[in-house]
Each structure stands twice: as structure tokens, then as C-alpha cells.
């Protein structure tokens, strides 16, 4: 894992990664924390980074427990606080709790977001991703 992190760091530095990414991170948790930060997501979306081959290296490390779904096929999510869909992932997402739901799509992922009651869903997607938004009651999707 350390070698993979070093490779990602080298590539990210060439693209102008923020100084929060030091290349000394040692665990999947360290990388997830940086990736899920607002600056991390912004950097990855802006630079279409990392590529799918690199994302796939993290799939065996159980990143789904962090709300990151890489080539996960078709799935249904209920009230996720955060869901990051990557690659060949197609999700139907139901948001009904009175809280903020953050949904991020990268590398061609697809989502149908259904928000109702007083839910607030924030959706960010890269070019090439597909999002269908449905709201009812007082819910909003931004």
C-alpha cells in the first residue's frame, strides 16, 4: 500500500496537489481522509485524478465502509451522509432524513437521486457522469 500511495503522491504533485497531501500517508484511512476533504474532491474532479486503474487498487481494501463505491455495479443506498460513486457504479439513492446528503460521481458513474421530506442532497459530478434528480415534499437537490 505504501508504494501505491507514493505513486499517487508523485502523480498528484505533478498536477499541483495541495500541501495537505505529503506523501507520508501510510494507510487507506489516511488517503480516504484526504480524498474526501473538500480540497481533495475538488482536485480529483478538476484533474480527473486518479485514473480508474489506480482507483481499482483501493477496491480490495474495503473502501465501501467509507461510502466509496468503485466499480460496484448496481446498488441502492438509503440516506447516505456521503456516497462517492466511481467507474462502473450505478446507484439509486434515497434521501429522506432531515440532514445533508453528499453525492459525488467520478469516472462515468451514474445515479438516480430521490429526495423527499426535508432532505437536502448535494450532488457533484464530473463530465461523463449521469445524474437524474427527483424531489418531493420540501426536499431539495443542489
What is the predicted function of each stretch?
Residues 1-142:
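Short, glycine-biased loop/turn motifs at secondary-structure junctions and
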